[in-house]
Amino acid sequence: MKKLLLITATFIFTALSLQAQRGYSEFENEEGMKVMYRWHRLSVFNKDSDAVLNLRVTNERETAVKWTFTVGFYDGQQLVYESEENTLCFRAGQSRRGGPAGLRFSLEGMKMEDVEKEAFSWDFGIFDVDEVDDCN
């Protein structure tokens, strides 16, 4: 019985982990920071809710780093949104993603159909990585 319970728990954990990774696209790997992203609606149940950019960032270095960045949304060459400057500390090999990590961005009134247009793009305005002794 314990073995069956352990196998079931392992299966559920694996399925949840895979679900959490699903849907992310690779953006870039710069200065030892691997960036992946995905777009989704703010409310899964409301087709008219705003589009949200979720980032998943991994420090692929063997040292801790302080990462300072801004995110910008563009309509063609026109900047329509820029986030405030953010700074996060990552231990060696650490990954973070989504809202709780401060890696979720949206612009009020911007819908999924807007981000799917050919003229729409997003990029980092600031992308600075500095090695630190430790994350406090």
Model-derived segments and spans:
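Short acidic, flexible loop segments centered on an aromatic residue
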Residues: 62-79
